[in-house]
Amino acid sequence: MNVDSDRLFTSWFYGLGNVYLYSKFKDENIITDRHFLSNFAWSGTEDNIEVYDLLVKKLGFPALTVILYANEKALFARLRSRDENDSDLDKVKKAKEKYEKMVFFCEKYEMPYMVIDPSELTPEQVVELIMKRIEGRA
């Protein structure tokens, strides 16, 4: 699916995953990975922005979106440690652009968000930062 160059198709395909998620867990508190932001970062274009407008209009958005930022060096090291031939290694050089698109999306739709660089943080510290934001302490 990720190799399909038809961005209108991929935006709908992954968007339908969000529709399914929201309908299956309606009125429940959930934590997801790869929400609208990832879909938009990889498939969003000027030609398909209406797809995202409709998804946000019909589904709303999370109470908080957390973007975990990592620089190219950290991303490359993480992926190589996972698998030296990881197919995602080629995507590392696009990371800065994708993070910028994610922030743009949050700001366009006025979604509450925060960006965290976990490079120097423990998982517990990352969770603490998120919890502070959720509880209104940050």
Residue ranges of each PLM-predicted region?
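Conserved nucleotide-binding/hydrolysis micro-motifs of P-loop NTPases
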Residues: 36-37, 70-75, 121
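Active-site flanking residues adjacent to catalytic metal/cofactor-binding acidic residues
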Residues: 32-34, 68, 116
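NTP-dependent small-molecule kinase module
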Residues: 77-86, 90-138
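A glycine- and Lys/Arg-enriched "phosphate-lid" helix/loop adjacent to the NTP-binding pocket
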Residues: 42, 47-104
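ATP-dependent small-molecule kinase phosphotransfer cores
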Residues: 1-53
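Conserved acidic residues
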Residues: 28-29, 62-63, 113
